[in-house]
Amino acid sequence: MTAHRPGLVVQHGATRNLVLPDGADPSDAEALVSCVVRGRLRKGRREHVRPVVIGDRVQFTQLEGPERQGAIEEILERKNAISRPQPSGGQHRKLEQVVVANLDRLWIVVSLAQPPLNRRFLDRILAACLHQGIDSGVILNKVDLPDATDPEPLRSVYESIDCPVHVCSATTGTGLAGLVSDLAGRIHAFVGLSGVGKSSLLSAIQPGLDLRVASVGEKGGGHGRHTTTASQLFWLPDVEGWVADTPGMREFGLWGMFRKELSDGFVEFREHAEDCRFRDCLHRSEPGCAVTEAVEKGEIDAERYASYAALLDELPVDELDARR
């Protein structure tokens, strides 16, 4: 085995991970090392489903010889991570599932049509990003479709809360130049429900990427098929940056968040919440709630508030608060 070397996890699979050694050419597939994870790093498996994810900085060793195989010996401290609860079912129901680590920005991709715009998913991810300290942005895709929702009111709502927004079409190329400029030189992730066009956007930004794209409607119901089988960081040589493409997710959990914390993920509530009659106001039906008054006056977007109310019902009450 070689001495410990630093590297970046660029692909996560069921049993092995591809690591790019520091200093190697990201465009050179021959530079990648296929690594297992040392058993001692799995000691937290009862609490965490995946000990290693794409974006992780690691120390690894490599076997002597041409096979380019090795082992991850250490996972370096993460600056951030996006997590969700393990999807329901099986023994891992309540375990944490980290999706990607060390992001510079998480882009939430939603479609303006086919499938229809999903504001609840969009607002869920934005709240999760704020809770976990990750910069986020919004990509409104499929603007070229004749039945597309008007993007300008949406752009106004999200830009008003300091969230960058790109209105794009992977088919016509509309808006891609501005998006490419924001991707340069950093690590980003695309997250979105199945069928919104994440893989198509990546292929339009960097032609030649080996992505399998399924047409919306292949399985009926206006939803695309899950086309990405492994979480992977893609190097975009024209951009000189990394973009993560993760398998389509039908649910993104607000991992570790309690009800009283949700309003922190809706930044437009903050200035109004200071005027609520009760300090522990959850902004539902409490008397003297300044947030609901602001919604009625049109000072807070009604759809954003509807997302907040729906998400609030999903979250647990802090045990300490429940005992008071």
What are the functions of these language-model segments?
Residues 3, 15, 31, 40, ...:
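Helix-rich effector regions associated with P-loop NTPase G domains
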